[in-house]
């Protein structure tokens, strides 16, 4: 078990929490994080890109000039890839980029990414994060108290919190996710990861870690 400090929004230590080694002291290879991030990014692609080959470009059915005795190079179509506005050779066509990973590999990648953050002192555990109103200024003040104003920060909450979400929405370097939606890509994209105690408990519960 690993013991991690619990802080309040004023950056005061208010307690400690024991977390299983698998979460913040995972021994898996770092390559699993790379695999998970590549898969996540590939799965975001629409794959709707499309170019036309010489047979699909409109026009070009007529031979532009006769084969011989013109002094010019021989051509059979103005839609040859050699011509301006001609077809594309080996261009992209619509395809599915989806990469399916086993659930266990995704979980391992997430825990390994969290382990890497923890070893770099980039994990913060808060007792609670709640706002009385929707106010960006209030969220900025909390980040300053936690000395996070110069870092990109991912906040993992147990449930969707409109006040936190809307207060953080206008801050370009802040991300807010539900703990159950957290993945290795999210963790890798931000400098710091902030959990609430309830958010971390929710993550452990969903992943079956005790």
Swiss-Prot record:
<dbReference type="GO" id="GO:0003735">
    <property type="term" value="F:structural constituent of ribosome"/>
</dbReference>
<keyword id="KW-0689">Ribosomal protein</keyword>
<dbReference type="GO" id="GO:0019843">
    <property type="term" value="F:rRNA binding"/>
</dbReference>
<dbReference type="InterPro" id="IPR023574">
    <property type="entry name" value="Ribosomal_uL4_dom_sf"/>
</dbReference>
<dbReference type="InterPro" id="IPR002136">
    <property type="entry name" value="Ribosomal_uL4"/>
</dbReference>
<feature type="region of interest" description="Disordered">
    <location>
        <begin position="49"/>
        <end position="76"/>
    </location>
</feature>
<dbReference type="Pfam" id="PF00573">
    <property type="entry name" value="Ribosomal_L4"/>
</dbReference>
<comment type="subunit">
    <text>Part of the 50S ribosomal subunit.</text>
</comment>
<feature type="compositionally biased region" description="Basic residues">
    <location>
        <begin position="63"/>
        <end position="76"/>
    </location>
</feature>
<dbReference type="GO" id="GO:0005840">
    <property type="term" value="C:ribosome"/>
</dbReference>
<comment type="similarity">
    <text>Belongs to the universal ribosomal protein uL4 family.</text>
</comment>
<dbReference type="InterPro" id="IPR013005">
    <property type="entry name" value="Ribosomal_uL4-like"/>
</dbReference>
<comment type="function">
    <text>One of the primary rRNA binding proteins, this protein initially binds near the 5'-end of the 23S rRNA. It is important during the early stages of 50S assembly. It makes multiple contacts with different domains of the 23S rRNA in the assembled 50S subunit and ribosome.</text>
</comment>
<keyword id="KW-0687">Ribonucleoprotein</keyword>
<dbReference type="GO" id="GO:0006412">
    <property type="term" value="P:translation"/>
</dbReference>
<keyword id="KW-0699">rRNA-binding</keyword>
<keyword id="KW-0694">RNA-binding</keyword>
<comment type="function">
    <text>Forms part of the polypeptide exit tunnel.</text>
</comment>
<dbReference type="GO" id="GO:1990904">
    <property type="term" value="C:ribonucleoprotein complex"/>
</dbReference>
<protein>
    <recommendedName>
        <fullName>Large ribosomal subunit protein uL4</fullName>
    </recommendedName>
</protein>
């Amino acid at each position: 078990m690993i013991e991690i400090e619990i802080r309040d929004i004023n950056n005061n230590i208010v307690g400690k929490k024991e977390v299983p080694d698998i979460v913040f002291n995972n021994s898996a290879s770092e390559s699993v994080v790379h695999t998970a991030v590549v898969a996540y990014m590939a799965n975001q692609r629409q794959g709707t890109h499309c170019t036309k080959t010489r047979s699909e470009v409109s026009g070009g059915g007529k031979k532009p000039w006769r084969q011989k005795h013109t002094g010019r190079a021989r051509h059979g179509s103005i839609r040859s890839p050699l011509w301006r506005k001609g077809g594309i050779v080996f261009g992209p066509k619509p395809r599915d980029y989806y990469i399916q990973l086993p659930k266990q590999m995704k979980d391992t990648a997430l825990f390994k990414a969290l382990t890497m953050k923890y070893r770099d002192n980039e994990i913060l555990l808060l007792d609670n994060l709640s706002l009385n109103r929707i106010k960006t200024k209030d969220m900025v003040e909390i980040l300053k108290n936690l000395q996070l104003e110069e870092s990109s920060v991912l906040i993992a909450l147990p449930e969707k919190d409109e006040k936190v979400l809307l207060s953080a929405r206008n801050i370009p370097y802040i991300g807010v996710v539900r703990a159950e939606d957290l993945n290795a890509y999210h963790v890798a994209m931000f400098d710091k990861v902030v959990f609430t105690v309830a958010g971390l408990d929710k993550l452990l519960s969903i992943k079956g870690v005790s």
